[in-house]
Regions:
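Chalcogenol-based redox active-site neighborhoods
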Residues: 1-155
Length: 155
């Protein structure tokens, strides 16, 4: 069972991102949509990232930044970001420090084989670094719209 982080202070984290940037939550003066996804360039992850891309300007109007996180390498992230024209950065978490801080590593099963993977999850963090809303086990369809609604109604 995942720990519920809603209403709690966000874990402080930093990491290497696309565009040769380093992200530090402590230095962000905006709200943040932090979405975790299993793997670059896979169907669900591509659709989810495109949906956030298409709504990005609306998130910015509400002083909210978006960061995508997966265990993929920076090179993989750069290719994915470029191919999908993503206007926001992707954080590379190969050692799973950020994934573990948000408790999104789960035992999964595919074709009868069990493995540890990223549970598609999103966290809405306000300017005070408090987690206002969390979504775990996300279904991609309509998710970015639901997150935008939360930004509009909860922040």
């Amino acid at each position: 069972m995942s720990k519920n982080l809603e209403g709690k202070k966000s874990p402080n984290f930093s990491g290497e991102c696309t565009s040769e940037t380093k992200f530090k939550l402590s230095e962000l003066n905006k709200n943040l949509v932090l979405y975790f996804y299993p793997k670059d360039s896979t169907p669900g992850c591509t659709t989810e990232s495109q949906d956030f891309r298409d709504l990005y300007k609306k998130f910015l109007k509400h002083d909210t930044e978006i960061i995508g996180v997966s265990r993929d390498s920076l090179k993989s992230h750069e290719n994915f970001k470029s191919k999908q024209s993503l206007p926001f950065e992707l954080l590379s978490d190969p050692d799973e420090k950020v994934c573990k801080a948000f408790d999104v590593i789960k035992l999964k099963s595919m074709y009868g084989r069990k493995y540890l993977g990223v549970d598609r999850s999103t966290f809405l963090i306000n300017k005070d670094k408090k987690i206002i809303k969390e979504w775990r086990g996300v279904k991609v369809k309509g998710h970015a719209d639901e997150v935008l609604d939360a930004v509009i109604n909860l922040l």
